[in-house]
Structures are given as structure tokens and as C-alpha cells.
């Protein structure tokens, strides 16, 4: 069999296949249908410093040629995530990439500091999601905001960090 391994930000993955954050929960929801051991990484749904209920329903609309969603980053919060989801993912032979979200720099830093000593492989900092009204989209569309949040997070993260940038700009 061919060697499919890749190096992502200094972390060796057995293959380049991961799931997009937000589409796969933290893996448990799909583990009966997808062998998580075959993935190079599981990128989790966004995790915030406290639980978020997300947007009111309906959150998904089918349209000609696809679908639109505005889930609003519903998540259990960092404490439950660390207690429940990380141990679940550790049973599999795959890398763990945690998507971090927040409404403010302080909220992002709360999550990053909490994850620093957890057995995860990388953090993906979500500064791209357009359905977060406070903070998230502002960081992702302003170069100074991106620079600030990235440099502050790097002060506390012990794992490699990747930034999930917004496509809602004229130039990246």
C-alpha cells in the first residue's frame, strides 16, 4: 500500500483526509457509519468556553443546487468537550484537531488555555464563520484582527495552530 502520510503544521497525519469542522460533530455521531481509524484527522465541531445553544430553528434550508445552514456554532462548551469528546476520540488511531470559536479574544483564549494540556494534536481557530454576530467574523475580515488573535493564541497554545480564515474578503 502507498504511503499517504502528510505533515500538517509539524504534525504527521497518516493520510490527508479529515472532515470539515461542523459537519461531523466530534465523531461519535458518525462512528457507526465511518471508521474513524481510517481518517488522517477528525476536525471537531467548534468548541467555545461555555455551551452555546446556536441559532433558533430552522437552521437548514434546501435550495436549488444545494443547501444553506446557519447553525450558530451550537456546542457543549469546553468542559464537557474535554470530559466526553476527547476521551472518545482518543480511542481511535487518528489525529484530533479541535475547532475553537468565541465571541471575543478573551473567550478564544479561555478555550486555548484549557486545551493546552489536553491530549489533542492541533487547534483550528475559527475566525471565519459568518453566522456568529459578535467577534468571529470581525477577526476574520480585518488583517489587524487576524494578526492580533493569532499572536495572542500562539502565546498560550502548546499544540500547532491553524487559522480558519473567512472567504468574505476581497484579498487574503
Model-derived segments and spans:
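Flavin-dependent oxidoreductase catalytic cores
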Residues: 1-172
